[in-house]
Amino acid sequence: MKVDPNKEKALAAVLSQIEKQFGKGSIMKLGEDRTMDVETISTGSLSLDIALGAGGLPMGRIVEIYGPESSGKTTLTLEVIAAAQREGKTCAFIDAEHALDPIYAKKLGVDIDNLLCSQPDTGEQALEICDALTRSGAVDVIVVDSVAALTPKAEIEGEIGDSHMGLAARMMSQAMRKLAGNLKQSNTLLIFINQIRMKIGVMFGSPETTTGGNALKFYASVRLDIRRTGAIKDGDEVVGNETRVKVVKNKIAAPFKQAEFQILYGQGINRTGELVDLGVAHKLVDKAGAWYSYKGEKIGQGRANAGKFLTENPVIASEINTTLRAMLLNGGANSSDSKTESDENIDLETGEVF
C-alpha cells in the first residue's frame, strides 16, 4: 500500500517528540516490540503453569485468585512468593486479614527474613503501600490478602450498622486506574486474593460473585478460581486437599483451562505427585500395574512411592520437569490436566462464570 511521504515524515516527527517527552518505548509499532514476550513466575504447580499457557503468572500485570474459604488461595500465593525468591526477586505481602502464619510460610519455602510484610489499618493505606512499592521499582511481587479485608477508612471510623454503599468498589476502581500503568512500568506482579459472596435473588446461573466491585475483574490479566474437590487421607487421617484451579480469564494465553493438583498440609503443593501423573499422561514415565518406571528403571510401587523416589532424587525430578515444560509449554497442553472448560457460560471480558 502506497503511503503519503508527508504523512510518514509527520509521523516520524511526532513519534520522536513523544519519545523525547515521555521516554523511549512510550510508543511503538506492535510488531516491532521485542519486549512482548511476557516474563512469568511459576505458581509452584507444573499443571497450573501449563494451564496458564505462558509457564506461570505474568510480571507487570494484575492477577486475581478467588475461591471459598480454606481452598488454598493463600498457599498458592506463598508458593508464588517462594518461587520468585528462588529467582532472587523481592516480594511483599500486604496482610489486610492479619492472618499470615510465618511458620507455615517458612515450611512452603518462603524466605521470611527477606519477605516484606505490612498489616495496614485501612484499605486506602494498603493500596497506597502497594502503589509506593510499585513506583519504587525495587519490588517484583506484591500479594494483597485479601480484597474483602480492604476496609475503607470511612467505614472503620463510622459505627457498626452505618450504610457505606459502594465505598469499597469506588476505592478499588480508583486504585486499579492508578496501579495498572505503574505495574507495567516497574514490571511488578500484583496478586489480589479475593473471597466469594452470594448474590441475592439469582434464579438462573451461578449466584456467586467476588467482593470489591467490578474494576478488578476488568483490570486483571489473569483470574484463577481455586476450589477444594476432595480430601487426601492417610488411613483415617486427612493429610491434604485435592485442588482444582480454573483459569477463568487469561490475557496472555488461551483461557478457560484447568489444573488439578494436591495441597498437603504443612508442605504445600505436591510437586512430585504432579510429575508422576503428568509423566504417565505424556509417556515420560511408564506404568505397568502398580509399578512406575523411568527410562527402564523402576522408581516405585504405587504413586506415593514413585513420588518419594523423585523427592529423594531431585536430579531425575528436575529432568522430568524440564522435559514436560519443553513439551507442553511450547506445543500447548491438551491433556486432561489443562483442558478447556466448555460446559459453562463465561463472560469473555471479565471471566465471570454465569
Swiss-Prot record:
Q: Kindly name one Pfam family recorded for this protein.
A: RecA
Position of the signal peptide: none
Q: Acidic residues compositional bias: what residue ranges?
A: 343-354
GO terms assigned for molecular function:
ATP binding; ATP hydrolysis activity; ATP-dependent DNA damage sensor activity; damaged DNA binding; single-stranded DNA binding
Gene Ontology cellular-component annotations: cytosol
SUPFAM superfamilies on file: P-loop containing nucleoside triphosphate hydrolases (SSF52540), RecA protein, C-terminal domain (SSF54752)
Q: Please provide the Gene Ontology terms (biological process) for this protein.
A: DNA recombination; DNA repair; SOS response
Is the keyword Transmembrane helix assigned to this protein? no
Q: Which UniProt keywords apply?
A: ATP-binding, Cytoplasm, DNA damage, DNA recombination, DNA repair, DNA-binding, Nucleotide-binding, SOS response
Keyword Cytoplasm applies:
yes
- Enumerate the residue ranges of region (Disordered): 331-354
Binding annotation for ATP? G67, P68, E69, S70, S71, G72, K73, T74
Which PROSITE patterns does the UniProt entry name for this protein? RECA_1 (PS00321), RECA_2 (PS50162), RECA_3 (PS50163)
| Record-linked InterPro entries | AAA+_ATPase, DNA_recomb/repair_RecA, DNA_recomb/repair_RecA_CS, P-loop_NTPase, RecA-like_C, RecA-like_N, RecA_ATP-bd, RecA_C_sf
**Where is this chain's protein located in or outside the cell?**
Cytoplasm
**PANTHER family annotated for this entry?**
MITOCHONDRIAL DNA REPAIR PROTEIN RECA HOMOLOG-RELATED, RECA
Q: What does this protein do?
A: Can catalyze the hydrolysis of ATP in the presence of single-stranded DNA, the ATP-dependent uptake of single-stranded DNA by duplex DNA, and the ATP-dependent hybridization of homologous single-stranded DNAs. It interacts with LexA causing its activation and leading to its autocatalytic cleavage.
Entry similarity comment? Belongs to the RecA family.
Protein name according to UniProt: Protein RecA
